[in-house]
Amino acid sequence: MTALFYLLFLTSVIIETHQECDMEKLDGDFPRQNNGYLYVCKDVETCFHICEERDLNRNHAKCCYENCFCEHLHGEKIRKQNVSLKI
């Protein structure tokens, strides 16, 4: 029982840390927010394209997949993320 509790605790710490780090890496007009949603790139190629437009190296923290938030509000390569969720 103790091992299960410890495993659940570690999992929640890792998830929370990952989510906090994602937001800490963003600045400027990232993320794009509209009507209570964030608009996030679905794939790494879209993210890299946005980073190249901003003259950012692909190894830059803002270009890590899932850290790159899209400027465009619509498109098949964009997903909506509810802002009310704790990020």
From Swiss-Prot:
The keyword Disulfide bond applies. It is found in: Secreted. Belongs to the long (4 C-C) scorpion toxin superfamily. Sodium channel inhibitor family. Expressed by the venom gland. One of its GO terms (molecular function) is toxin activity. Residues 1-19 form the signal peptide. InterPro entries: Scorpion_toxin-like_sf (IPR036574). One of its GO terms (cellular component) is extracellular region. Keywords: Disulfide bond, Ion channel impairing toxin, Neurotoxin, Secreted, Signal, Toxin, Voltage-gated sodium channel impairing toxin. Disulfide bonds join 41-63, 47-68, 51-70. SUPFAM superfamilies: Scorpion toxin-like. This is Putative sodium channel toxin Ts40. Putative sodium channel toxin. The keyword Nucleotidyltransferase does not apply.
